[in-house]
Amino acid sequence: MSRYRGPRFKKIRRLGSLPGLTSKRPTVKSELRNQSRSSKKSQYRIRLEEKQKLRFHYGLTERQLLKYVRIAGKAKGSTGQVLLQLLEMRLDNILFRLGMAATIPQARQLINHRHVLVNGHIVDIPSYRCKPQDIITAKDEQKSKTLIQNYLDSAPREKLPNHLTLHPFQYKGLINQIIDNKWVGLKINELLVVEYYSRQT
């Protein structure tokens, strides 16, 4: 299954706020409608929608998300928490959380077009797994800096999570540590996502 490129508002109207996909927010009316429907949903539907929220927020294909679930399942600790850490430490998400891109698709575009450096080296793989002490910078070219400056100026001013530090005038971000799950940028019940996949096998 390919990455979603359809109408974004349609998705947030059904699944709720997906800040990684779009900065738009669902209307109060659609949120109330979703709440009234939630009591009528089957357990399968509830798990499916949590999985879809995760997939669309981080901009993943079905195959990519399944791969992350399998990696998380083999790691020590809670599978759901490890899954969220893996997704949050992707380079495209780090760029988004730093405010150097307004959405994850925008971050992915910057990375694909080679505007982003990690520890002084160009990285053009959005799924690159960042680690503590990594330094994320704009390429030392005017076009790269202008693009990122525009995003820094236009991105909504969210409180920066504790695991990140931003130096906007240097076009630089620092990863201080692995993310604490309370700072995950999406309201999600990750256990339902793990349950969804465990019941598919």
UniProtKB/Swiss-Prot annotation:
Instruction: Return the SMART domains for the record.
Output: Ribosomal_S4, S4
Q: What is its main location?
A: plastid
- A Pfam family assignment: Ribosomal_S4
**GO CC field:** chloroplast; small ribosomal subunit
Taxonomically, the superkingdom here is Eukaryota
Q: One MF term from GO for this chain?
A: structural constituent of ribosome
Which cellular compartments is it found in? Answer: Plastid, Chloroplast
- List every stretch annotated Disordered: 15-44
Q: Where is the S4 RNA-binding domain?
A: 89-151
Give the record's keywords alphabetically: Chloroplast, Plastid, Ribonucleoprotein, Ribosomal protein, RNA-binding, rRNA-binding
Gene Ontology biological-process entries? ribosomal small subunit biogenesis; translation
InterPro entries the record matches = Ribosomal_uS4, Ribosomal_uS4_bac-type, Ribosomal_uS4_CS, Ribosomal_uS4_N, S4_RNA-bd, S4_RNA-bd_sf
Q: Which PANTHER family match?
A: 30S 40S RIBOSOMAL PROTEIN, SMALL RIBOSOMAL SUBUNIT PROTEIN US4M
Q: What does this protein do?
A: One of the primary rRNA binding proteins, it binds directly to 16S rRNA where it nucleates assembly of the body of the 30S subunit. With S5 and S12 plays an important role in translational accuracy.
Q: How does it assemble?
A: Part of the 30S ribosomal subunit. Contacts protein S5. The interaction surface between S4 and S5 is involved in control of translational fidelity.
| Membership in a protein family | Belongs to the universal ribosomal protein uS4 family.
Q: What is this protein called?
A: Small ribosomal subunit protein uS4c
User: From what organism does this protein derive?
Assistant: Glycine max
Name the encoding gene, please: rps4
